[in-house]
């Protein structure tokens, strides 16, 4: 029921809304076009629907100009993303993903900033068999992309405490219960026969035939770690623990990182805490929040369609009142909590029940075999003997989790044999870095990110070392476009691609993920970046207060103005 007080924005529906409306619940003509061998690509309308099945059509942009000269179509390929709530994979599932990446992908796995696997380079005629093998491993790609609830994140290591384990179970339940109900995925990819005559109301009781105006992201944090950047989520839950027992969750709404260059009506935003719910109320809060976005989100202008804009347009208190109206009960007052950081903690740690966990540093989240670093092979060999699990972190790293005391020696030997690392030989800056895929596969990228950030850090490390800052954690993030997949606006140093070799530089985000950055320099190249840091980092080394983080220092020192809300991000 739509509230008469709150108003949905006016305007004609976007072309994507029309595509969804005509799609027969995300079917479109995908089944037919995937059989077509004339082109390696698919029509744009079907590509818009393909997202909801966990995939995007891409092309190798390194080859684009040469193929145009040869009058060939782009080197089309598909990216495939797995739905994996909380980032948990069994060793058997890891081996399946490893095999598929070698057989059908580009011999790499990307560990994403939302705790899941991405595979790149899959050809159209290999898509169905790849998806079928993923499903046979008890994983899937449903709703990993698209205008639905995406992969539900949670604090990375559920086995470090009973609380983490409990929170992980809630993330799985949310992910499963908020899935689209259409059987399109199963019919197109898994050869399920369609059941005729299913009433529309039963097809998508929560989403409806148009699904959501844009993607929707949920994450659960366990203080004092904000590793999932809970304030960046459309809907964030903050676990509240009293006397070692999970009593419920603070509820935060309206976060999101994406924006559009040059359009100040778009901006990153942090969610705001509006109250507290008990664990058994979690799903009800999530479902009702999603239906508010379904009913009031902007379906006319997609760049203003995320839930953060809905909240800012309608007003936080009005959205809270509407949520409580739909719930039929009021949220309790938010409980106190505290975050220390939003990064990972590396190396071996002993958890509950005598189990061990090794958090390893994987630069850019890219699992592959390098010339002198057989990372993919090493992890494959560990997966063959490991009896615990793997945990993909929201900082693109990996936890070899739930290792028994009996297995620890064997796994430690493999870690040493293949040179797998907890990052201690790297600077804390590098260990705190994150980059999206960007070029050559992402169609939105305006500049390099994953391929370039390590090289830039090589040069920044010289400045860091000169100033005694090698062990100082400074979060640094780079994205190839303003969409924010690597949560650039929450990096103490952030870069957003503007053009090849050119970036907007941002400073001043909080180390615990509670404050956005602000643009410091626009459209600058490497020399200008390094020149700025040669000025700022020595000042930080000399003038900082005890325990003061870089993002706080640049504000106190007057180098950058604090961003107090996403609505003044561009000021």
Swiss-Prot record:
<dbReference type="InterPro" id="IPR006066">
    <property type="entry name" value="NO2/SO3_Rdtase_FeS/sirohaem_BS"/>
</dbReference>
<feature type="binding site">
    <location>
        <position position="485"/>
    </location>
    <ligand>
        <name>[4Fe-4S] cluster</name>
    </ligand>
</feature>
<dbReference type="InterPro" id="IPR005117">
    <property type="entry name" value="NiRdtase/SiRdtase_haem-b_fer"/>
</dbReference>
<keyword id="KW-0408">Iron</keyword>
<comment type="function">
    <text>Component of the sulfite reductase complex that catalyzes the 6-electron reduction of sulfite to sulfide. This is one of several activities required for the biosynthesis of L-cysteine from sulfate.</text>
</comment>
<keyword id="KW-0479">Metal-binding</keyword>
<feature type="binding site">
    <location>
        <position position="442"/>
    </location>
    <ligand>
        <name>[4Fe-4S] cluster</name>
    </ligand>
</feature>
<keyword id="KW-0028">Amino-acid biosynthesis</keyword>
<keyword id="KW-0560">Oxidoreductase</keyword>
<dbReference type="GO" id="GO:0019344">
    <property type="term" value="P:cysteine biosynthetic process"/>
</dbReference>
<keyword id="KW-0349">Heme</keyword>
<dbReference type="GO" id="GO:0004783">
    <property type="term" value="F:sulfite reductase (NADPH) activity"/>
</dbReference>
<feature type="binding site" description="axial binding residue">
    <location>
        <position position="485"/>
    </location>
    <ligand>
        <name>siroheme</name>
    </ligand>
</feature>
<dbReference type="InterPro" id="IPR045169">
    <property type="entry name" value="NO2/SO3_Rdtase_4Fe4S_prot"/>
</dbReference>
<dbReference type="GO" id="GO:0050661">
    <property type="term" value="F:NADP binding"/>
</dbReference>
<dbReference type="GO" id="GO:0050311">
    <property type="term" value="F:sulfite reductase (ferredoxin) activity"/>
</dbReference>
<comment type="subunit">
    <text>Alpha(8)-beta(8). The alpha component is a flavoprotein, the beta component is a hemoprotein.</text>
</comment>
<dbReference type="InterPro" id="IPR045854">
    <property type="entry name" value="NO2/SO3_Rdtase_4Fe4S_sf"/>
</dbReference>
<dbReference type="GO" id="GO:0000103">
    <property type="term" value="P:sulfate assimilation"/>
</dbReference>
<comment type="pathway">
    <text>Sulfur metabolism; hydrogen sulfide biosynthesis; hydrogen sulfide from sulfite (NADPH route): step 1/1.</text>
</comment>
<feature type="binding site">
    <location>
        <position position="481"/>
    </location>
    <ligand>
        <name>[4Fe-4S] cluster</name>
    </ligand>
</feature>
<dbReference type="GO" id="GO:0020037">
    <property type="term" value="F:heme binding"/>
</dbReference>
<dbReference type="InterPro" id="IPR011786">
    <property type="entry name" value="CysI"/>
</dbReference>
<dbReference type="InterPro" id="IPR000626">
    <property type="entry name" value="Ubiquitin-like_dom"/>
</dbReference>
<feature type="binding site">
    <location>
        <position position="436"/>
    </location>
    <ligand>
        <name>[4Fe-4S] cluster</name>
    </ligand>
</feature>
<keyword id="KW-0198">Cysteine biosynthesis</keyword>
<dbReference type="InterPro" id="IPR036136">
    <property type="entry name" value="Nit/Sulf_reduc_fer-like_dom_sf"/>
</dbReference>
<dbReference type="GO" id="GO:0070814">
    <property type="term" value="P:hydrogen sulfide biosynthetic process"/>
</dbReference>
<dbReference type="Pfam" id="PF01077">
    <property type="entry name" value="NIR_SIR"/>
</dbReference>
<protein>
    <recommendedName>
        <fullName>Sulfite reductase [NADPH] hemoprotein beta-component</fullName>
        <ecNumber>1.8.1.2</ecNumber>
    </recommendedName>
</protein>
<dbReference type="GO" id="GO:0051539">
    <property type="term" value="F:4 iron, 4 sulfur cluster binding"/>
</dbReference>
<dbReference type="GO" id="GO:0009337">
    <property type="term" value="C:sulfite reductase complex (NADPH)"/>
</dbReference>
<dbReference type="InterPro" id="IPR006067">
    <property type="entry name" value="NO2/SO3_Rdtase_4Fe4S_dom"/>
</dbReference>
<keyword id="KW-0521">NADP</keyword>
<keyword id="KW-0004">4Fe-4S</keyword>
<comment type="similarity">
    <text>Belongs to the nitrite and sulfite reductase 4Fe-4S domain family.</text>
</comment>
<keyword id="KW-0411">Iron-sulfur</keyword>
<dbReference type="GO" id="GO:0046872">
    <property type="term" value="F:metal ion binding"/>
</dbReference>
<dbReference type="Pfam" id="PF03460">
    <property type="entry name" value="NIR_SIR_ferr"/>
</dbReference>
